Amino acid sequence: MKTLRRLLLLVLVVLCSLLFVQAQPKHKASKPKPVSCSQGTPYRGCPACGTAKDNKHRTLNVQKNRGTAVTSPQKITVQEIRNPANNTKFTPSKKVWVTGYVASVDPGGFQETCNCKRNDLRDVHINIVADPSEVGDQSKYVVVEFTPRWEKRFGFDDSNYDAMRQAVEDKIKGKWIKFSGWMLFDFIHANASQSTAPGNPVCPNDGKQHSGCNWRATPWEVHPVTAYTVVSGP
C-alpha cells in the first residue's frame, strides 16, 4: 500500500511539473531593433527611412532619400555601371556623373515604402543606354531616378504626378543627358536585372509590367540624381 501511494504521489508531482512548464510564457527569438529614423531629413512629413520595417530596407530608403547634392563626382560610363564584373566594386557612398541616352521616362514605383506609400510622393524612373541603338533592349537599361526631394528643385511641378512625368519626358527623352548623383544598389530588383539574374529572359518592351524577366541591366542605379544637363553626346 505504501508503495502504491508513493507511486501515485510521484505521478502527481510529474504531472504538476509538466503543467507548470506548459503554462510558462514562450519567449520568441528577439528581432534586431529597427535602425533609428534620425538619419537623413524628413520631407513633407515622410522620414528618410520611409515606412520600411526592417533595417535593410530602412537603410536602402535613407540612401534613396538623400537630400545633399554630390560634389566633385567621378566620371563613370553606362557600360561600367552595367558590367557584372563591377557589381561588388561600387558603394552607395560613391558620387558619380554619367552621360547616357534617355531611352524612356517611366512612372516610378507606386506607393513605395521610401515615399511612405503616399500617392503624392513618387519617383520618376529614367532608363538610359550607352547608344541610341540599344533603345528597346531592356537588358541594356541603366536606371537613374528623380526623387520627390529633387523634382521641385529641378523646377517640376509635382502637384500632378502624370503631368510632371510627362514634362520630364518632354525635356529629356531621346536626348543625351549628363546626370550627377549618388550610386545605389537597389537589391529589391536583383531578380530582374541582367547582371544578377542572367538566366532570365528579357522582358518585352511593350510598356507593360512583367514578372520573371529582366527589365533592367543591373540593380546599380544613380539614385537620387542631384543635377542634370542636356549635352551633345557622350
Enumerate the predicted regions with their spans.
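Bacterial N-terminal signal peptides that target proteins for export
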Residues: 1-8
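Bacterial N-terminal signal peptides
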Residues: 9-18
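OB-fold and OB-like single-stranded nucleic-acid-recognition modules
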Residues: 24-234
